[in-house]
Swiss-Prot record:
Protein name as catalogued: 5'-nucleotidase SurE
Family: Belongs to the SurE nucleotidase family.
SUPFAM superfamilies in UniProt: SurE-like
A GO CC term assigned to this protein in UniProt: cytoplasm
EC number, as in UniProt: 3.1.3.5
InterPro entries named among the record's database cross-references: SurE (IPR030048), SurE-like_Pase/nucleotidase (IPR002828), SurE-like_sf (IPR036523)
Entry's localization field: Cytoplasm
Keyword hit for Hydrolase: yes
Any Pfam family the entry gives: SurE
C-alpha cells in the first residue's frame, strides 16, 4: 500500500491538516506528523540545539503524531522514527491557511520548508495553501473568518492521485498549490512562476515601558506583479496557482560568464 506523509506548519490540530488527511486518505496509508502548535514562518529550520519530543495523539479517531519542533523536524521524525527510515510515496504539506506565493514566502514558509525536506530525500511533495481574508490569520489559529477547504481538498486529492500514478515531471520536486479566497470547482488553474516579492518590507520601532526600542518586521502586500507569476494569478486574476519548484537553487546561467567574473579577482 502506498504511504503518504502529511504535515503542516499550523499545528497538528489545525483544520487544514485535518482537511489534507481527509483529502488523501483513500489513496493510501496516511501518516500525519506535525508540530504540536503554530510554527508558521520558520522555513526549513531544524532543531539542533534542543531535544525533540513526539507524542501520539488522536486526530478524528485516527493515530497521529505531535512534534515539539518545526515542520521540518516533523518530516524528519515522521520518516526516520514513525516510518523507521522507509520513505513515503508522497508528502503533503498543508492545507495552509495563508497563501505561500513569491520567493518571499517560499523561502520563509514552514509549509514549504517541510515539503523541501521531504523532497531532499527524493520524495515527491505537494504544498497546498489557501488565501486568507486577513493577513493576521496566517499566524493565529483564531481566524477572523471560517475558512472552507472543500475546493482545496478536491484539487489536492486529484493532484496527489496523479502524482502517485505518474510521478513528478522531470526536474520538479514540489508542486506549490495556492487557491484564491472563495475559489470554487470552476476556478481556473494556471501554472505559474514565483514572483520576486509579496511584501514591501517595513520595520516599525516601538518603545517598552523603560524606553528601550524593540522592533516589528512587517510591510504592505504587493498585489500587482508581472504576468505569469503566482502573485498575479492569485491576487489580480483570482486563479488557482500551481508553481513547480525544484530544490536545486543553482542559477541557470552560462558558467563561463561566472569564470569570466572570477578572472578579475
Amino acid at each position: 500500500m502506498r504511504r503518504i506523509l502529511v504535515t503542516n506548519d499550523d499545528g497538528i490540530y489545525a483544520p487544514g491538516l485535518r482537511a489534507a488527511v481527509r483529502s488523501v486518505e483513500d489513496l493510501g496509508e496516511v501518516i500525519a506528523v506535525a508540530p504540536s502548535g503554530q510554527r508558521s514562518g520558520v522555513g526549513r529550520s531544524v532543531s539542533v540545539f534542543e531535544p525533540l519530543r513526539m507524542a501520539e495523539v488522536n486526530l478524528d479517531g485516527k493515530k497521529a503524531y505531535a512534534v515539539s519542533g518545526t515542520p521540518t523536524d516533523s518530516v524528519i521524525l515522521g520518516i526516520f522514527v514513525v516510518m523507521n527510515g522507509e520513505l513515503p510515496d508522497l508528502a503533503v504539506s498543508g492545507i495552509n491557511v495563508g497563501e505561500n506565493i513569491s520567493t518571499d514566502t517560499v523561502t520563509t514558509s514552514g509549509t514549504i520548508g517541510a515539503a523541501i525536506e521531504a523532497a531532499s530525500y527524493g520524495v515527491p511533495a505537494i504544498a497546498a495553501s489557501i488565501q486568507v481574508a486577513d493577513q493576521g490569520d496566517k499566524f493565529d489559529n483564531n481566524h477572523s473568518v471560517e475558512y472552507k477547504f472543500d475546493t482545496a481538498m478536491n484539487l489536492l486529492r486529484r493532484v496527489a492521485s496523479r502524482v502517485l500514478e505518474r510521478g513528478m515531471p522531470v526536474g520538479v520536486d514540489i508542486l506549490n498549490i495556492n487557491l484564491p479566497l472563495n475559489a470554487t470547482e470552476d476556478t481556473e488553474i494556471v501554472v505559474t512562476r514565483l514572483a520576486r516579492k509579496i511584501f514591501k518590507t517595513a520595520v516599525e520601532e516601538r518603545r517598552d515601558p523603560r524606553g528601550r526600542p524593540y522592533y516589528w518586521i512587517g510591510g504592505d502586500l504587493i498585489c500587482s506583479e508581472r504576468e505569469g507569476t503566482d502573485v498575479r494569478a492569485v491576487y489580480q486574476e483570482g486563479k488557482i496557482s500551481v508553481t513547480p519548484l525544484t530544490i536545486d537553487s543553482t542559477a541557470k546561467v552560462d558558467f563561463g560568464e561566472i569564470m569570466d567574473l572570477l578572472e578579475v579577482i
